[in-house]
């Protein structure tokens, strides 16, 4: 006896496939009943023996009707949902409608999927169009049916379906400190270790963009002040040499270092918010702020942390000239013994962070003390 498939092919009748399909529908509702599944499969098998050839659509209808007959209406509905996803997967092209709606601006699900993507500009639209094709293939060929069915029903939300096809990582904690200290390669060009704070900020912003173009989730600059502190000292040494014969050498050096610090952090903030990655988005970036007293670059770390907070308090201007709170980079500030208590050495930074939070809803806070307890004595930023 044979089953006539949708494309007209004839294949041998396999009763176990009916049992498995019913079992999956039952399992999705935690109502496993092998006896009923086997009974229905046997009834259909008897029909197939009598007919010798049976159409796949007839089998599906019989499964549904027999489930209802066995007082399994909810399982019958689950089977219909399972069958609908299978039917979707058989279709060779299902993305045309979604792509046309995306171009027209009416595909709200895709448009609103990520806050750092402006879906109304051409580069982003092209990325999203490619994403719709990837999503379509993933839905039909890659993602398990029960997960896809749960997504469609709203039981769960499978985020970034459009990136599931390729072997890309999601969020990460790249070693930016090493890339700046030892140099790196961008677009097949060797990037040497920066010789000044301003250049370090510029190179770092380029690294953020490159990482964002190579993955689909967030990234964190872990201990951002420690990453940049050595280059602030290099700039200081540069100015000390420049003004070595001046009577007011210290005042001039201090003035120039503070100016370069402000300019560098401003460059970083503006580059992050204006650079576009290859998929038309701003880098989804977190700056994690935490340093320890007694470290080699303690003074520079404190200066950098303060400047990051002050510039976030100042905000950025939107297209209409009104000051706004930039979404990125996200800021995370670690509370520790040396900054959390009144009278502690860096309590002034925590007060500044609190002022920033009151005005800009950032930074978020983590407890360094608790993190050490649960993370083997380590303190580090969130992954993205």
Where are these regions (language model features)?
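Conserved catalytic cores of very large enzyme subunits
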Residues: 88, 96-384
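Charged, amphipathic alpha-helical regulatory modules used
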Residues: 1-106
């Amino acid at each position: 006896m044979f089953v006539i498939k949708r494309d007209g092919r004839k294949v041998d009748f396999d009763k176990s496939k009916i049992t498995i399909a019913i079992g999956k529908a039952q399992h999705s509702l935690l109502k496993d009943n092998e006896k009923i599944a086997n009974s229905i499969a046997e009834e259909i098998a008897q029909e197939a023996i009598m007919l010798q050839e049976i159409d796949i659509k007839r089998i599906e209808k019989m499964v549904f009707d027999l489930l209802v007959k066995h007082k399994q209406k909810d399982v019958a509905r689950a089977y219909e949902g399972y069958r609908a996803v299978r039917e979707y997967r058989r279709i060779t092209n299902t993305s045309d409608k979604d792509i046309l709606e995306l171009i027209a601006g009416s595909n709200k699900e895709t448009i609103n999927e990520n806050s750092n993507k402006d879906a109304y500009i051409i580069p982003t639209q092209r990325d999203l169009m490619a994403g719709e094709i990837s999503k379509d293939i993933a839905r039909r060929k890659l993602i398990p049916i029960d997960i896809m069915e749960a997504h469609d029903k709203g039981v769960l939300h499978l985020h970034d379906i459009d990136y599931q096809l390729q072997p890309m990582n999601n969020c990460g904690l790249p070693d930016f400190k090493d890339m700046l200290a030892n140099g790196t390669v961008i677009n097949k060009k060797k990037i040497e270790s920066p010789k000044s704070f301003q250049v370090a900020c510029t190179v770092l912003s380029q690294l953020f963009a490159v990482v964002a173009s190579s993955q689909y989730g967030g990234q964190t600059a872990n201990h951002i002040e420690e990453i940049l502190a050595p280059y602030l000292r290099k700039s200081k040494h540069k100015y000390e040499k420049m003004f070595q014969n001046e009577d007011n050498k210290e005042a001039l050096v201090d003035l120039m270092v503070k100016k370069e610090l402000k300019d560098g952090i401003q460059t970083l903030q503006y580059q992050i918010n204006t650079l576009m990655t290859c998929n038309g988005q701003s880098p989804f970036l977190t700056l994690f702020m935490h340093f320890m007293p007694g470290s080699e670059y303690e003074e520079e770390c404190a200066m950098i942390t303060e400047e990051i907070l002050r510039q976030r308090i100042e905000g950025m201007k939107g297209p209409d000239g009104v000051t706004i709170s930039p979404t990125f980079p996200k800021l995370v500030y670690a509370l520790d013994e040396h900054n959390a208590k009144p009278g502690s050495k860096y309590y002034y930074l925590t007060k500044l962070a609190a002022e920033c939070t009151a005005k800009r809803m950032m930074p978020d806070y983590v407890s360094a003390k608790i993190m050490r307890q649960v993370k083997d004595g380590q303190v580090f930023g969130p992954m993205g």
